[in-house]
Amino acid sequence: MAENQYYGTGRRKSSAARVFIKPGSGKIVINQRSLEQYFGRETARMVVRQPLELVDMVEKLDLYITVKGGGISGQAGAIRHGITRALMEYDESLRSELRKAGFVTRDARQVERKKVGLRKARRRPQFSKR
């Protein structure tokens, strides 16, 4: 591994992201594409940038990210979690600030499974009295 490179793994729903951080000019590369190319939705881009904006390091670090599985919001959440972990490896003093914003905790919510006899996880078929 190259020196002064920091790593963090992030997970959310069924997505997993590997994030590598090194000092640079603020370039973000996700699966060999830029942030703007990879995420069409502005909300997803905002979620990815949140931890960097919180600690004022948007222009100071280069990010190389690989992400697999899930959909757009799951991948954005996984990347945010990975960036947070990599930032804590980079500078441990950022931990309290990131924890206060709620980025350190892994969101453990998963899709509830569909049950037999129901239409979805909890949606029951319509009830008819007669």
Swiss-Prot record:
GO terms for molecular function: RNA binding; structural constituent of ribosome. Residues 111-130 are annotated as: Disordered. Keywords: Ribonucleoprotein, Ribosomal protein. Residues 116-130 have a biased composition (Basic residues). One of its GO terms (biological process) is translation. The keyword Ribonucleoprotein applies. This is Small ribosomal subunit protein uS9. The lineage of its organism: Bacteria, Pseudomonadati, Pseudomonadota, Gammaproteobacteria, Enterobacterales. The gene is rpsI.
